[in-house]
Amino acid sequence: MKSSGIAGDSNGFETNFLNETTNREEDGAFNWNAADDGTNERREDIHVRFQDSALPLGIDENELDEIDINGDSKKLDSVEVDESHDVNSPSDSRLKSSFKSVLELTANSMVSVLTPSTKTEQTSKGKGKKKKAHVSFLEGPVEEIPLDDIEPTSPREASPVFNGRPPIPPEFLKSRHKEFTIPNPLQFISNFLSNLFSRDTRYLKSSHGRIIIINPYDDSSQIDERTGKPYMQNSIVSSRYNKYNFVPLQIIAQFSKTANCYFLLIAIMQMIPGWSTTGTYTTIIPLLIFISIAILREGFDNYRRYRQDRVENRIQTQVLRHVDVDPPIVEEHSSFFRRRRWRRSRSQESASRSTIRSTDEREPERTSEDPPQLPPSPSSPSSPALSVKPNIDPQPPLYNSTLTTTRSIPANKPTFFWASCDRKDVRVGDIIRLTSDQTLPADVIALSSPNPNGAIYIETAALDGETSLKTRLVNSTLRSLCKDINDLIRLSGTCTVEDPNGDLYNFNGSMKLDSIQGEIPLSNNDVLYRGSNLRNTSELFALVIFTGEESKIRMNAVRNVSVKAPSMQKVTNRIVIFIFALVVSMAIYCTAAYFVWQKKVERKLWYLTNSKLSFVPILVSFIILYNTMVPISLYVSMEIIRVFQTFLVQSDIDLYYPENDTRCEVRSSSILEELGQVTHVFSDKTGTLTDNIMLFRNLSVGGFAWQHVGAENPKLVSTSQKSDDLDGEAKPPQLENIQGTTIQLLQYVHDNPHTTFSKRVRIFLLNLAICHTCLPSFDEENQIYKYQSISPDELALVHAAQQLGYIVIDRDIDSLTIRLHYPLDPHSHPIAKTYRILNIIEFTSKRKCMSVIVRMPNGRICLFCKGADSAIIKRLRLSNLAKRKDKSVTKAEQARKSIEIDKAIIRNSQSTSRPSLTASRPSLSRRRNDYINNVTSWLDERREKMGVVRPRASTSILETRRRPAVGRHSLAGGERLMEDKKYLSKQEEAEGSIYESLNHNDAKLFENTFEHVHAFATDGLRTLMYAHRFIDESEYQSWKLVNDAALNSLSNRQQLLDEAADLIEKDLEFAGATAIEDKLQVGVPESINSLFRAGIKFWMLTGDKKETAINIGHSCGVIKEYSTVVVMGSLDGVEGSDETVSGGQRLSLDRPPTNDPASLMIHQLISCMNAIHSNSLAHLVIVIDGSTLADIENDPELFLLFINTAVEADSVICCRSSPMQKALMVQKVRNTLEKAVTLAIGDGANDIAMIQEAHVGIGIAGREGLQAARSSDFSIGRFKFLIKLLFCHGRWSYVRLSKYILGTFYKEQFFFLMQAIMQPFVGYTGQSLYESWGLTCFNTLFSSLCVIGLGIFEKDLSASTVIAVPELYQKGINNEAFNWRVYFGWCSIAFIQAFLVFYVTYSLFGMKELNDNNIFAYGQLIFTAAIFIMNFKLVFIEMQYINIISIIVLVLTSLAWFLFNIFISEHYPDKNLYLARSQFLHHFGKNPSWWLTMLFVMVCALTIDIVAQMLRRTLRPTDTDIFVEMENDAFVRSRFEQESGEFLQANAPSVDEIEQYLKSRD
């Protein structure tokens, strides 16, 4: 009798239980969606389809029930059958059969339909649970539907992953996820508190979507039916903590450090009376101080983020507001009673107006207790009153009210105006006004635009990373109803939109206005998202629908960002646990030894009476005695070191970008050492790798290639990897086809205007000028034409046409005017021609081309077409010939590159074990000269293995620029005609015949052009082909009827349009090709190459299209000549077609049994894994787009297979990815590879989620603003700065922190082991060897400064060395500086030195000096020797970079120790166990034996350390040891400085300096 949200229909029905909405479909279905509370990742959907025309259910709409899925009780809307219904009727069987249609479950699923009185069931087997979703009826037998009888479907019809996918071999499904690890209870509590104090309500579902009341007269806050409260404010919050959760989360974070928990336990034991031998509060007070310092530092970082948010939230926005008078200012001469009467009248009118609500029955009614709503303040959405003097727009009021005539007398109608208010005060339902170049403050529905056809131009770089302009068209109905403010104030109705979500590409909604009949449908074209920039639109009126954290850009940001902890902290915590276990073990041993000693010795000593101790006090006393083996200042000193390291990073001049005055900013100093251990870099493309500046580089026309002179010098601007490779053996021969510059081309066309070649050139240039959608505008100030386009490619092409004499000067809906002139002659007379635009066939990803049909000035109709090579070739008149030539050119190109593949495989196989200079060597010093002599060849060899060739030291930089190639084709084909690039001026007559001959040889023309296109693509350029066709009038009119019918179709419109386009885009004449460079930032290819050499894997995650991403991959070196590029889900990608694999190695793969995309992807991934394991791939790059990734996510096994393959690949390119998909990729790599350290770098707001998800987040402060920079851990000005940040500061920080931690553990264990060694001499009574005041100052005055100096100033290698040799970065990746082996090495030295110092001192001084052999003199001798041994070791043995500050610190520490001895000698109490008073000054301090013993012990201990270091460096030298030696040679240093000059502009020597040095050396 009851069901939630089900509506019957004679043709079927559909209901969505999760959304509680009713939607009709022809086939009849209802969706049952079960989602876990609190999560948005897992969702179970059951589609039940009724094919019968009659509905056999009696239904009501108000009850919720429960259902058991996976053993969890979930609250769901359920279906109940009418008790009177006959379950045995025929309709019941039809009902049961219809339940067999099921959609996706998140794992291997089985659905059972249970009739009434049957309880829910659950089955699970092993890891993969077989889930059963149950629907209960009131009575009847049980029917179970096996999985084989179910027809799986997907909510997305395009989802490929559930239809007959083949089984995946289990060896490829070995999950490396850390899903079986025991969860950290502190992390669990942290997550709980985070969710408790900052509950996220954005994902709650409403029953009918969000209903927004449109009523400009009502300024009251609208109510969100999901929460019963006003809609979320428009303020944003990027800070990690709030005032409620900061203290508890920080306490948890601090005590997640094992050392802090250890000292808390010690402090508790110390405060128990009678247990401590060192005092009561000596641990708890320092512990609280150190923890408070750490919490305050984190709080300061969080406060800085809060202030940045406040700046963002206070940006001014114009909102439509009203007041009772205009403005509500009372005249000064008004009487007191008159002003009072005016206020009372205004209050009553506001109260009555606030009760006006929409008559929609779904709007919640206001209760009688609700206070009356008054006109709002522009500064606060919750404030009911408008300020007395509102900030009114300076323009005159657009609504002329009679109220303005009498300012002091209230009237019936309010005055509307545009009030400037803070962005945070914009509310849902507000109507806002925006002007050009403003940033949208919230997600809005566009209402009106003054541009023709209601066009709106926006830049969405902050959302998807694309800086190209996008066009939105305002709905024509809305545009007619919202022309000005007079129309806006009359606007009344409701707007229903979907609930807040993060989908940037789909939107559904509708608007119902009182002034018109029916509803206005709303789509993604009608909505503008927060963060977008309004361009070329003078004014925009818009309705706010989503605000603050519910806006799309914030929905795609990571919420409740967890505190990032460095990887080294895990190892440090484990070592602390080990030391604690060691302390407990030593305490237990000493306690047991004490009872043995008590039984055998103490009982016989008559002078020891009443001295027996129990087990617990003696055990605790030993634990407290040894507890400082873990220094209490460990983590606080690390914070001090990080503060100084932060200063060094931020003051680095090499990381300063002067163009926008940006320096490197460190926002999370706690993870500085993570920069030295990065294994994966995830990078955005637009604005991060590129400048998003398209540069027209080359064109090919008539079978000859030309370099555009508008492009800058290739060496200076080219970001292609090939810019430095042309002199290497891998030089593509096709680049030699470049004949000259476009200036020479124009000169030839001008001098020979009537030749066939010239005519071909002119029609090609006309194609450039016509086939686009750019809008021209004239800049009066600079007297030039500027263009706006949604595509930067088109912008570059139109600019090129302008430079070549075809200037687009005007454009409207149906015409295009071009001014023709000869650019080489400033006195030429331009001619303007107007072309009537008949049709524009827009570009689609399926067609991969666009066409413009125009009527020429002479009346003829011509179609101009441009697109990808694959799209144009099949549309040509000579398509068969073109396909054959394209295939032959491709085959020849692949044959050439197969040689490079074989060489790369050989290089990779030779370097499998990472050949370095660390092979076994009998003597480092003996072979040092060999290394120095071969350093140049070694560096060249490492570059060659990465496919990079760079100039030698003695080569002038000017000589290494790309040399212009010359032509090599003749009439016979294949022979080189010219050796000089300037042959046009010398052999015009011969060349003219050459050009004309090729225009009559179609086969040769195609062959040459395709060679050019391959060469351009290999060079990383974006290529397009052009074609045209003249059309008869009758043919065009016939086609126009078909095209118009497709345009007016209400169903399958795009398909019909594509079919119509195919009818006219045929039999085209080939015109030529162009090559555009998406200009990379300076140094990007070199930076990415350095990352590869360092062993770092590079993933490019971009929102751009696939072709663009692949082209950029070629340009920046992610895709190499010998790379195998696998495009997921693309059959062409499997075959290695030119479209997706530009000359790369073909992946050997049998055809999948079906064309099912899921089967195809499984075959692709399995083949990749097999090839990787067999080492048959030189370089693997996987390309996947966002839609394919979304489909893969729905199949856990396929997704696991993809991740396992992707982490093995050399690089991954993810295109068309949303912000959350970027974050998902980072998260999956983190979870899959336990030891991976991920770094994400981006510059836009769409990169924030990825940046916050990675271990290290880096934001680039660039053209897209500071959103990413503010949310990152580090911010830099350019991508190339990443190299020094990682290789220098990251590596140094890792080495410094490693040596600091090791040095701290070393000094504590060395110092306190001698306490344990002394215990047999004092009967294991816990007697301390050292005086208590000295112990108190040991970690603060006498041993901390030198080890902190080591952690601040250490540089094991210079900056030029670590940048010139990126392989040295693997020291951090492999954890070579800080691991258990290195730790035990330091412990061994401490253990040996402790025994040596104690027993040598005991032998030389303790037993022979009868005058001064008391425990104080003996202890001070060992104390003094220990201090000098520790500090000398840390400064002179362990530190490679010894500076004056380290020496000063050592001297100050030594002086502090002797001053301390002088102080206690004068002021120490007389009555004490330690006879310290006057001892140092008057007794053992004057004894030469005391000083000589100390010096002898120091020399012995340090000698052991030096000998151990020499043996290690001789027998097992590391890369660092070798390059430390090499740096001692001036030539090697100069060579390294030259190699690193690209990244060290402040210190790089010039080529002349290098050459001068080499001459002086000779």
Swiss-Prot record:
Residues 71-86, 358-369 have a biased composition (Basic and acidic residues). One of its GO terms (molecular function) is phosphatidylcholine floppase activity. PROSITE patterns: ATPASE_E1_E2 (PS00154). The modification Phosphoserine is found at residue 954. Residues 1-38, 55-94, 115-134, 146-166, 347-406 are annotated as: Disordered. Catalytic component of a P4-ATPase flippase complex which catalyzes the hydrolysis of ATP coupled to the transport of phosphatidylcholine and small amounts of phosphatidylethanolamine from the lumen to the cytosolic leaflet of the trans-Golgi network and ensures the maintenance of asymmetric distribution of phospholipids. May be involved in transport from early endosomes to the trans-Golgi network (TGN). Belongs to the cation transport ATPase (P-type) (TC 3.A.3) family. Type IV subfamily. This is Phospholipid-transporting ATPase dnf1. It comes from Schizosaccharomyces pombe (strain 972 / ATCC 24843) (Fission yeast).
